[in-house]
Amino acid sequence: MGGLEVEKTTIGWAARDPSGVLSPYTYTLRNTGPEDVEVKVLYCGLCHTDLHQVKNDLGMSNYPLVPGHEVVGEVVEVGPDVSKFKVGDTVGVGLLVGSCRNCGPCKRDIEQYCNKKIWNCNDVYTDGKPTQGGFAKSMVVDQKFVVKIPEGMAPEQAAPLLCAGITVYSPLNHFGFKQSGLRGGILGLGGVGHMGVKIAKAMGHHVTVISSSNKKRQEALEHLGADDYLVSSDTDKMQEASDSLDYIIDTVPVGHPLEPYLSLLKIDGKLILMGVINTPLQFISPMVMLGRKSITGSFIGSMKETEEMLDFCKEKGVTSQIEIVKMDYINTAMERLEKNDVRYRFVVDVIGSKLDQ
């Protein structure tokens, strides 16, 4: 196990200010505690939330800030009380690295709703050290917030599942939408949206992609396996599709009207919000009243659900569509992500980027 009290440093790529530009940054890892594992990072996905974080879009960022919360790595050290993992295991780390363990949500195994949850970056751990994310050589994480990657699953493919994948799996699981034969809509075809199509199809759903243009029609239907494609500005087609969907997963990360999409839902249908939007959304109340429809939200998923989701994706052969880049390309990747110029998730080859050279 090595000396658990020896202070270690690691190298990551951090933003220093709201410009969001990342550059190399050396910092101290916290000590490996009794229930901690040290993870050598292999791959880390790039999520739209990383953009919000490094650019301080929500007014809560503290710098220097190492982003990255779709982390796949190899266990290189374990604390004496670790029972779930051993050195050499391939594991994943998502957006959370801590919670209080005592509140209602924690006792219900939905720790993502704990008021004292600890984010994997831009937060402070229980020992007072700042948390830093997966665009780095290594991390130290409590074993509760680490999951084993199923044997045979490619690590670069697993990375986006730890945020994009669980973000769509959790609401489908919680709201009772796992059974086959349902009709679902995916609003927005980015990193989360493309996983929504794949996971919903694997559950046996009829899936309609809803987008603002025809640009992604061929991709959605021929490559991702969607059953239908709606352009939201095509009023005739939108009218034809009214009252047809059991649910819509809304992944759009910018302000947009809700009423056109509420009209697509059946009675008791759910519009499930996923995008992080810092401006108010508007709708008129009869749009929900007259169909007993719901506007709700969901936030990533629990550790238990994440394990279930990984097993589900392995069993069903669900993979993510990715573009692998090295760390020295990360600022360009972020610029492209901001312009939606990626099909559909950037994954950083951290181990291949040789950060210590």
Curated annotation (Swiss-Prot):
In this chain, NADP(+) is annotated as bound at: 49, 167, 188-193, 211-216, 251, 275, 298-300
Q: Check the UniProt entry and state the signal peptide residues, or none.
A: none
Specify the protein name.
Probable cinnamyl alcohol dehydrogenase 1
As for family, the record states: Belongs to the zinc-containing alcohol dehydrogenase family.
EC number, UniProt record? 1.1.1.195
Gene (name only): CAD14
Tell me where the transmembrane regions lie. none
Q: What broad taxonomic lineage does this protein's source fall under?
A: Eukaryota, Viridiplantae, Streptophyta, Embryophyta, Tracheophyta
The UniProt entry, under PROSITE patterns, shows: ADH_ZINC (PS00059)
| GO MF term set | cinnamyl-alcohol dehydrogenase activity; coniferyl-alcohol dehydrogenase activity; zinc ion binding
Q: How is it modified after translation?
A: The N-terminus is blocked.
Biological role stated in the UniProt entry: Involved in lignin biosynthesis. Catalyzes the final step specific for the production of lignin monomers. Catalyzes the NADPH-dependent reduction of coniferaldehyde, 5-hydroxyconiferaldehyde, sinapaldehyde, 4-coumaraldehyde and caffeyl aldehyde to their respective alcohols.
| Induction, per UniProt | By fungal elicitor.
Cofactor binding mode, per the note? Binds 2 Zn(2+) ions per subunit.
Q: How does it assemble?
A: Homodimer.
List positions binding Zn(2+) 1.
C47, H69, E70, C163
Q: In which pathway does it act?
A: Aromatic compound metabolism; phenylpropanoid biosynthesis
